[in-house]
Amino acid sequence: DFASKLIQLKLEKYKELVATPLQLDLRENLRVKSKESAFLDLNRSFFLYRLVVLGIDFAKIKRSSQDNATWAENWILQWTPEAEIQIVESVLKGDTIADAVAFVLSERIIEATKISEIADVIEDAFNCGLPKIVEGAKRSLDETANGAIAMCDIADTVSKLSNMISFGDIRKLDREPLIPIVKRLCIRASLMLVGESACDDIAAATLADDIQKIHSVFMMQDFLDESFWFDKLIELSNRDDLNTKISGLATAILLDAGKIDELTLRMEVSRRLSMGMPAELGANWFAGLSMRNHYALIGRLTLWESLSEYLDTLDEEEFRRSVVFLRRAFVEYSAKEKDMIAENLGEIWGLNAQAVSEIINSEIKEVDTDILEDFDFGDF
């Protein structure tokens, strides 16, 4: 079956010991007459993905240099003695490559314990052009989704399914059955959001990524009702008894979406960065706020004025507590973005922007490291 497919898909010349690149255009070729020729590259993609699922090292996919070109795929093909052995071993799983892949994916569905693992099977079946496996995995996902699910599992699953719904039309498979699952999981994520946010800072790091994945799905898919999700984000933003980094992130998302105006932001910053708020909590909230849309935050001078005023109110011990979280907040900022922050702070403090920039962009000095090592972090 492998040999006949190489001939049918015009891939015989790639059965060489030297690695050879292959670029595929999955769109229909309208310049040819036969259906087989029109979808040659799409069928090549199905075939190569099937080899990947079977663990046959004849083909390896590379990320396209055009991020938005969902129709473009880049592969590296290379024949090896190991690939020949792997093909022989795959015969035990089915008489044809398609049968063997169906067997492997069906086994993975049976062994799956998380919905994200089933979503991986759906994604692989989707890429392999196996609609019957997609349907079987969808039914299994429906059943598993009725049980207890972690937020990270929901985030991974809806992110994968959403990408298939948005960009999968190029593979000529029916994606409609996936829509109800995404709807149900996104509603469940909305219901879980506030409760999950009562967590420590270690769990908050993972939860922050999950929230951003789920929010991206809400923004990408028109069939989702985002109003309930935003209601929960507003509640999360206003609550004081939840992880402050997650509350800050919720505020940042609402700010991006135009759900918070400048006056409301200024009031929230003043509330969070005040003498009544423990230093580490205020700095952690600001770290959450800084996780999204850096340029939008940098452009708000009032935000940096509030931060400056807040730091002025801290004593030495409180400042040391807050600086740990603030340094983490700026880790994800580029040198250019830090320069722009320096200009803001220089203007507020009446200092030279370049001098401030050098301090912000500098590495931690040994004496600073010693101070941090001597500091008692036990309280938090």
Each language-model region and where it sits:
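Extended repeat-based interaction scaffolds and adjacent low-complexity, acidic/S/T/P-biased segments
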Residues: D1-F380
